[in-house]
């Protein structure tokens, strides 16, 4: 379940790819709400607006200006939705490849990288995490289909909106039932 600045997936949690609930997941899994974003047409001399409405592309950086103070508000910050000029790394390991030395890490840092998996909590499938930037429409937290902005102009820099998605690597992780369910005592389907 993706909750963030402007995002929430349309499908149910832990539904494998290829099922009816996720057939259009790549196009509609993230969103922006119209109330959250304060946009305005730029009428400044440095950024002239297009003459005709037909010439304008909705969401292009040339005609959407966002107040940078909007991103300082805590309710609009999310680890799953990001505005950036370049794609973010997928994990903490990729961020610290150059400057991380495994000998200098403390025990707590190692424990966070390798969580304990024997606590009775199992994922329904092996997951794949990706950052997606090519969204055009999505479903917001309230269930409304909204249009996602292509580019955003913040302080004269063009930013893209990236959404963090988690999907199942294999649509059927186990032959029968759900992974992590005791088949001797429970009937399940995924």
Swiss-Prot record:
The transmembrane residues are none
| Keywords assigned | Cleavage on pair of basic residues, Disulfide bond, Glycoprotein, Growth factor, Lipid-binding, Metalloenzyme inhibitor, Metalloprotease inhibitor, Protease inhibitor, Secreted, Signal, Toxin
Q: Which Pfam families match?
A: NGF
Q: What the entry says about post-translational processing? A: Glycosylated.
Task: Offer an example of a GO molecular function term for this protein.
Answer: peptidase inhibitor activity
GO annotation, biological process: cell surface receptor protein tyrosine kinase signaling pathway; modulation of chemical synaptic transmission; negative regulation of neuron apoptotic process; nerve development; nerve growth factor signaling pathway; neuron projection morphogenesis
Q: Which domain of life is it from?
A: Eukaryota
Q: Which GO terms describe its cellular component?
A: axon; dendrite; extracellular space; synaptic vesicle
- Signal peptide residues are 1-7
User: Which purpose does this protein serve, as stated in its record?
Assistant: Nerve growth factor is important for the development and maintenance of the sympathetic and sensory nervous systems. It stimulates division and differentiation of sympathetic and embryonic sensory neurons as well as basal forebrain cholinergic neurons in the brain. Its relevance in the snake venom is not clear. However, it has been shown to inhibit metalloproteinase-dependent proteolysis of platelet glycoprotein Ib alpha, suggesting a metalloproteinase inhibition to prevent metalloprotease autodigestion and/or protection against prey proteases.
Question: What's the protein called, per UniProt?
Answer: Venom nerve growth factor
What species was this sequence derived from?
Agkistrodon contortrix contortrix
Lineage here is: Eukaryota, Metazoa, Chordata, Craniata, Vertebrata
